Design a protein with these regions (language model features):
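N-terminal intrinsically disordered, low-complexity segments enriched in P/E/S/T
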Residues: 1-131
Length: 131
């Protein structure tokens, strides 16, 4: 995508360890996929976008099952969205929506509790392309 800092031809590729080195945060939130409040731990997506030097207005996210969603880059800062790698302190397995899950702090603002933001919350994330 449109990024300034690459580590492969025209792209930035990360493994779990390299993502974690960027710095992790945790928050608790209710969500439509789990009962009660769940603790999610991951990399702030604004930090990841800053790290790669993202230039664009949206990110196209593709999941392992080829589900795609488009997220405005402005969401990442405005809502403190994370790329979660852990749920309740455990790494997320593929069969449990892992290894990477885009999570908003849904119950921090009433506007986040709707289908628009749930649809942006891709799990089993395999690729993100800045457009």
């Amino acid at each position: 995508g449109h990024i300034e800092n690459t580590n492969e031809e025209g792209k930035a590729v990360f493994d779990l360890a390299s993502l974690e080195k960027l710095g992790m945060v945790s928050f608790q939130t209710a969500s439509p996929w789990y009962n009660g409040r769940t603790t999610f731990t991951g990399i702030p997506l604004q930090k990841l976008m800053d790290y790669v030097g993202a230039k664009g207005s949206v990110v196209k996210v593709t999941a392992l099952n080829d589900y795609t969603t488009i997220i405005p880059l402005s969401d990442f800062k405005k809502y403190n969205v994370i790329l979660a790698v852990k749920i309740n302190e455990k790494y997320i397995r593929v069969r449990d929506k892992g290894p990477l899950f885009i999570v908003y702090p849904y119950d921090s603002m009433p506007e986040l509790n709707n289908q628009v933001f749930y649809a942006r919350s891709a799990w089993q994330v395999s690729r993100m392309n800045i457009e």
